[in-house]
């Protein structure tokens, strides 16, 4: 995890291993120029273009509990992930994934800010959400805009606003995570009835 944040905070960042790993790489000569998203059991990956030359980024998040193996056996873990993608999806990598890098995913357990209020931290560096929340990119953009407003003098309460927003996102994302992963038909029935009423509540929708 970021050593820079540790230096800025002058304390260890409050993070923990999320029992998942990220595999990133580059694909070339792709015929499909669209953004592709694949959701599977215990893994998902995204393929998106980075230029007009049919070059693409590939990023996957896979459930993986053995942190020591991730640290010490990169090639073995890479092959396991690639085999899983090949066996459980129709996406064919054809040994075309280059510049692969593998790293464990850490998420934040607490909201920590620097003592120096002239230092602004944003995105995952400020608070790393679980990848399943799908909030990384949007919160990076949103927090960068809030920093801009602070620098322009339009606002002066960046960290206070971020703390409130992060708490809302965590609560809502946790609710969604459990509410939409029910398998019992009876539980799903009552969930759907509850959502019909909640969807009419403006406070719930905020």
Please name every model-derived segment:
Residues 91, 133-134, 149-206:
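C-terminal helical "tail/cap" subdomain of flavin- and related membrane-associated enzymes
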Residues 2, 127-128, 160, 165:
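Active-site micro-motifs of SAM-dependent methyltransferase domains
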Residues 4-6, 111, 131, 149-150:
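Active-site-proximal flexible loops/turns
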Residues 5-6, 123, 162, 191:
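Short, cationic motifs built from Arg/Lys/His that form the positively charged side of catalytic pockets
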Residues 51, 60-135, 139:
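FAD/FMN-dependent oxidoreductases across multiple families
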Residues 1-90:
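Conserved FAD-binding catalytic core of PHBH/FMO-like flavoproteins
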Residues 138-152:
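Short, small-residue alpha-helix embedded
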């Amino acid at each position: 995890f970021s050593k820079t944040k540790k230096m800025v905070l002058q304390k260890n960042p409050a993070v923990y291993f999320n029992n998942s790993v990220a595999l990133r790489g580059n694909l070339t000569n792709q015929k499909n120029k669209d953004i592709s998203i694949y959701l599977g059991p215990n893994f998902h990956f995204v393929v998106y273009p980075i230029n007009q030359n049919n070059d693409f980024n590939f990023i996957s998040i896979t459930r993986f509990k053995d942190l020591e193996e991730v640290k010490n056996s990169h090639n073995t873990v890479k092959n396991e992930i690639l085999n899983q993608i090949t066996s459980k999806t129709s996406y064919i990598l054809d040994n075309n994934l280059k510049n692969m890098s593998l790293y464990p995913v850490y998420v934040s357990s607490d909201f920590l800010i620097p003592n120096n209020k002239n230092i602004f931290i944003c995105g995952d560096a400020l608070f790393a959400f679980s990848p399943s929340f799908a909030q990384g990119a949007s919160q990076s953009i949103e927090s960068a805009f809030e920093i801009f407003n602070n620098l322009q003098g339009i606002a002066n309460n960046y960290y206070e606003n971020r703390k409130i927003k992060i708490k809302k996102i965590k609560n809502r994302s946790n609710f969604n995570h459990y509410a939409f992963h029910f398998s019992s038909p009876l539980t799903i029935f009552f969930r759907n009835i509850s959502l019909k009423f909640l969807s009419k509540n403006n406070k719930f929708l905020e």
